[in-house]
A protein has these predicted regions:
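Short, conserved loop/turn and helix-capping segments at secondary-structure boundaries
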Residues: 50-54
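Catalytic cores of nuclease domains that cleave nucleic-acid phosphodiester backbones
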Residues: 1-48, 68-74, 106, 110-118
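Metal-dependent nuclease catalytic regions and adjoining charged, substrate-binding loops involved
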Residues: 14, 62-215
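Residue-level signal for functionally critical sites in structured catalytic/ligand-binding pockets
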Residues: 6, 21-24, 37-39, 56, ...
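Short amphipathic alpha-helical face segments that pack within enzyme cores
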Residues: 55-63
Length: 215
């Protein structure tokens, strides 16, 4: 089929103009489109899957439908695995067999796509109104913040890598006592990766400020 790369499409929802830049649009023999997106990611993203990929690519499918009136029948991630190891691939059955993997992403119904896009735009519009009128803004979820939870690491003297990570201090201390002398518990504070590294407005965000003040 024909390939179209890096096209940005625009559409209007609830009076707002929104857009998305699609890495690859492949036109199939039946005239439908396959959307492909490139990601440099970890092996664990492939093993466990990422909900954010489904949201992103279904939004792209919605854009194509709105702008071109053409059906999208397949969504794919071309994943470049930065931490892939050939030795692991030999012995682990669920481990990716190559450093580059194509992952099929679930395609939602058109009504699901419509509802998702409208809901997200409405949330942003409500947040803007709340900010203007100095009202509390709905907080971002852990998924939206790419949050890594705080952990309690059981450490062994002379070893850099944790023996085990626990969610609670009590579990970590109990584990330490079982292991005996030479083991300690280190607290590893969680972090909202998207907020700290990728958000342009975190400096103005009350949720981000509170999270850091609590730390």
């Amino acid at each position: 089929g024909d390939y179209l790369s890096e096209q940005r499409l625009f559409a209007e929802v609830l009076g707002w103009k929104i857009s998305g830049a699609i890495d690859i649009q492949k036109t199939e023999a039946d005239g439908s489109i396959t959307i492909m997106d490139y990601k440099c990611t970890s092996v664990w993203s492939i093993i466990f899957g990422k909900d954010s990929w489904a949201k992103q690519l279904n939004f792209y499918a919605w854009l194509v439908r709105q702008c071109k009136g053409v059906p999208v029948n397949k969504l794919q991630i071309v994943a470049v695995l930065r931490d892939w190891k050939q030795s692991e691939a030999k012995f682990k059955p669920d481990y990716p067999k190559s450093g580059i993997v194509i992952v099929d992403v679930p395609l939602w119904s058109t009504s699901q796509q419509d509802d998702f896009v409208t809901e997200r735009v409405a949330l942003h519009q409500q947040a803007e109104k709340d900010y203007v009128f100095d009202k509390p803004i709905a907080p971002c979820t852990e998924d939206e913040r790419w949050a890594r939870k705080s952990k309690h690491a059981v450490m062994k003297k002379g070893r850099k890598k944790a023996v085990k990570l626990h969610d609670s201090e009590e579990e970590a201390v109990a584990h330490c006592e079982v292991l005996g002398a030479g083991h300690t518990v280190d607290f590893r504070k969680g972090e909202s990766i998207r907020c700290s590294q990728y958000c342009d407005v975190s400096a103005f965000c009350s949720q981000w400020k509170k999270e850091n003040a609590d730390g």
